[in-house]
């Protein structure tokens, strides 16, 4: 890739970003767009916060502004934590980690690495003229002592990354434990999820077995339980009932306006259908029918957090395949349909998910290889001679090779997070948060394999496969060379993902167009509701982590990329802070359980950076530097093992010490009984089939709580 191609990519991405941000700053002032740009603040839970919209046709309403940008840097972390939860704060701190790390690397690169790379005694003028290699480690001659500068920078960057990681892990853990104390009213702190519940031999019901077991073995701490039921039939009928009630309201409204006999007849028919469905629901919700639909799953509530944590983290039954316990997710986080999946089928589901993810990865190797073919224009002309026609249009070849490959790749990659989230759902996770965490893992490794490694192989090594087969020992050296050769492509990828990607994220162009089409077609005359969606951690975290990985690997190899990454993380911080404040809803809070996975992604990035440098030092005939880098790899691995021992268990489990401290605080304030009694009924309000419909009720007011905590 030539400097002209890189300049074309930067110009296009900067232009798109400026236009998108300009449009956003104007469109968000228009009252009709509030359902898109202020969806969270318009929702019922956050409607108390006023909106500053221009209702009159005044000039400021149509002028762009940047007032929303400094807002992101003014809000303290404590306020983010109280408004959005610790998961949102973890994402914000991920962007801050990127800013701090790459800012230091940029200063180091500008002061040491760039001068050393550029002013080399054996620079090749032709390479400096036609490529960016003059600013990379590729410009250093074999065996040069200048490589010790790169070696020193590698150690410095690695230790700084480990220092930041340790600092973040420690601080987030402290905030997590404090947040658990602040959220002591949450039902999941008192509740244990029990799976594989056996049948009671006396009464032939599972609810009875749960009650007998915990009453006997947790006599003084057990409070109550709630069985789960196969409510697919009930959910279907409840949905049908809701639809009929809405239709009935519309027909009554029409009758008032028209005062016709035809409308009165239709209303009578709808009321009769509604009564029939109500009786069917009432029948299915009888205790006899519910017992027949019992699932081997129960939520068991304890009288203290300490006893709940002990029960969740210990083996209950002599047969480890029965009465399997774990801390329950919070009620709004439960994946109700996955709880109905039998435990013995879950391993098959997981194998199927792994196979599907592998097939998806292989399938996407085709477009990635094609994209790299476009990026290498000289090779593209050999493979596809008609491509030479673009040379007749001035500047077009720079656009095609500089901007188009990264834009196409980003377009293909957009659908991957949603596909992986669907696969994670099929894996049978008990909560939505665990589904998102699994999706994060799959998306990150998919991006690492397809976007990074496959881009290296298909872009730099495709024409040397035969040589690899004949000389397999040279593969590490060739891979190290490939990393250096692909610096320009990944620079354009960072530009596209950051400038264009973040700008289009905040613009929400697709949703704006959909809202306009809906308003003038099937949604005409209907009330417009906010487009409120859950925050897409599964999409944001892996993408940002991939950019950290690319930046780390190229921190010593191509320091010219580092300032672009500082801009990438600054823009990402501003954009996603705005989305948290105004657009996306926080539907659950895991109290920071995303961080250990983010830590792992960054650890993998550091290891890849160090291994790449070992290969590059070998390629540059500096074996002493390569050997001296091996202890750094071992230190990094040892540090990661330390973090697994020191921090990770407190994210996986509910520490007994913390549970006791919260219990003591509750007992001191006289709130313990209130909290565990509320916890006993919290899950009833979220399971669809636990809503009773009485046959004596009015057809338009048909729901009330179904059962108590012991539904047996």
Curated annotation (Swiss-Prot):
Pfam families: PHM7_cyt, RSN1_7TM, RSN1_TM
The keyword Transmembrane helix is annotated on this UniProt entry: yes
Annotated keywords: Calcium, Ion channel, Ion transport, Membrane, Transmembrane, Transmembrane helix, Transport
TM annotation in the entry: 6-26, 94-114, 146-166, 351-371, 407-427, 442-462, 494-514, 546-566, 597-617, 623-643
Chief location category: membrane
Membrane topology (UniProt): Multi-pass membrane protein
Family: Belongs to the CSC1 (TC 1.A.17) family.
Function of the molecule: Acts as an osmosensitive calcium-permeable cation channel.
Name this polypeptide is given: Hyperosmolality-gated Ca2+ permeable channel 2.5
Organism: Arabidopsis thaliana
């Amino acid at each position: 890739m030539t400097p002209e191609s890189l300049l074309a990519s930067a110009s296009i991405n900067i232009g798109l970003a400026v236009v998108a941000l300009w449009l956003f700053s104007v469109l968000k002032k228009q009252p009709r767009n509030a359902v898109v740009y202020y969806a969270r603040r318009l929702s019922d839970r956050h409607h108390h916060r006023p909106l500053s919209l221009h209702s009159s046709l005044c000039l400021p309403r149509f002028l762009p502004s940047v007032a929303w940008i400094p807002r992101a840097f003014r809000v303290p972390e404590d306020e983010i934590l109280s408004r959005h939860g610790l998961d949102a704060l973890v994402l914000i701190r991920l962007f801050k980690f990127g800013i701090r790390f790459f800012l230091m690397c940029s200063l180091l690169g500008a002061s040491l690495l760039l001068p050393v790379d550029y002013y080399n005694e054996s620079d090749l003028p032709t390479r400096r003229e036609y490529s960016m290699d003059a600013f990379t480690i590729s410009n250093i001659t074999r065996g040069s002592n200048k490589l010790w500068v790169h070696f020193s920078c590698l150690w410095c960057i690695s230790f700084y990354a480990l220092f930041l990681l340790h600092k973040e892990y420690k601080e987030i853990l402290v905030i997590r434990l404090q947040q658990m104390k602040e959220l002591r009213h949450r039902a999941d702190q008192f509740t244990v999820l029990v799976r594989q519940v056996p049948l009671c031999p006396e009464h032939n019901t599972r609810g009875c077995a749960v009650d007998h077991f915990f009453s006997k073995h947790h006599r003084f701490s057990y409070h109550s339980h709630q069985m789960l039921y196969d409510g697919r039939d009930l959910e279907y009928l409840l949905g049908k009932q809701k639809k009929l009630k809405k239709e009935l309201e519309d027909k009554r409204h029409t009758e008032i306006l028209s005062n016709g006999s035809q409308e009165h007849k239709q209303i009578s028919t709808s009321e009769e259908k509604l009564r029939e469905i109500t009786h069917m629901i009432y029948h299915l919700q009888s205790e006899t029918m519910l017992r027949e639909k019992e699932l081997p799953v129960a939520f068991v509530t304890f009288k203290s957090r300490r006893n709940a944590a002990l029960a969740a983290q210990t083996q209950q039954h002599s047969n480890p395949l029965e009465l399997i316990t774990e801390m329950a997710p919070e009620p709004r986080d439960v994946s109700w349909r996955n709880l109905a999946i039998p435990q013995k089928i879950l391993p098959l589901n997981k194998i199927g998910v792994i196979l599907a993810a592998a097939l998806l990865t292989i399938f996407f190797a085709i477009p990635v290889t094609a994209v790299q073919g476009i990026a290498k224009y000289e090779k593209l002309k050999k493979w596809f001679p008609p491509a030479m026609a673009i040379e007749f249009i001035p500047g077009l070849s720079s656009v095609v090779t500089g901007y188009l490959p990264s834009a196409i790749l980003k377009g293909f990659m957009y659908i991957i997070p949603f596909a992986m989230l669907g696969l994670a759902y099929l894996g049978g996770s008990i909560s939505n948060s665990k589904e998102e965490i699994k999706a994060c893992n799959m998306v990150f490794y998919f991006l690492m394999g397809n976007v990074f490694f496959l881009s290296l192989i298909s872009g730099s090594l495709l024409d040397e496969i035969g040589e690899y087969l004949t000389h397999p020992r040279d593969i590490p050296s060739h891979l190290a060379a490939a990393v250096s050769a692909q610096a320009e492509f990944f620079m354009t990828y960072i530009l596209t993902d950051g400038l264009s990607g973040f700008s289009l994220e905040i613009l929400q162009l697709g949703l704006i167009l959909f809202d306009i089409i809906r308003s003038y077609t099937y949604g005409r005359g209907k009330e417009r509701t906010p487009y409120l969606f859950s925050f897409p951690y599964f999409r944001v975290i892996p993408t940002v982590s991939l950019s950290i990985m690319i930046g780390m690997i190229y921190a010593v190899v191509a320091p010219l990329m580092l300032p672009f990454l500082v801009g990438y993380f600054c823009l990402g911080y501003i954009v996603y802070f705005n989305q948290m404040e105004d657009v996306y809803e926080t539907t659950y809070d895991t109290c920071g359980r995303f961080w250990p996975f983010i830590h792992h992604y960054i650890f993998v990035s550091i290891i890849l950076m160090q291994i790449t440098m070992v290969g590059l030092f070998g390629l540059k005939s500096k074996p002493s530097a390569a050997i001296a880098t091996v202890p750094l790899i071992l230190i990094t691995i040892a540090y990661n093992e330390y973090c697994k021992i020191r921090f990770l268990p407190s994210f996986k489990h509910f520490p007994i010490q913390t549970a006791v401290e919260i219990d003591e605080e509750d007992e001191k304030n006289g709130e313990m009984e209130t909290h565990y009694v509320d916890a006993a009924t919290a899950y009833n309000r979220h399971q669809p089939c636990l809503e009773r419909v009485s046959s004596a009720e009015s057809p338009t007011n048909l729901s009330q709580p179904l059962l108590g905590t012991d539904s047996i």
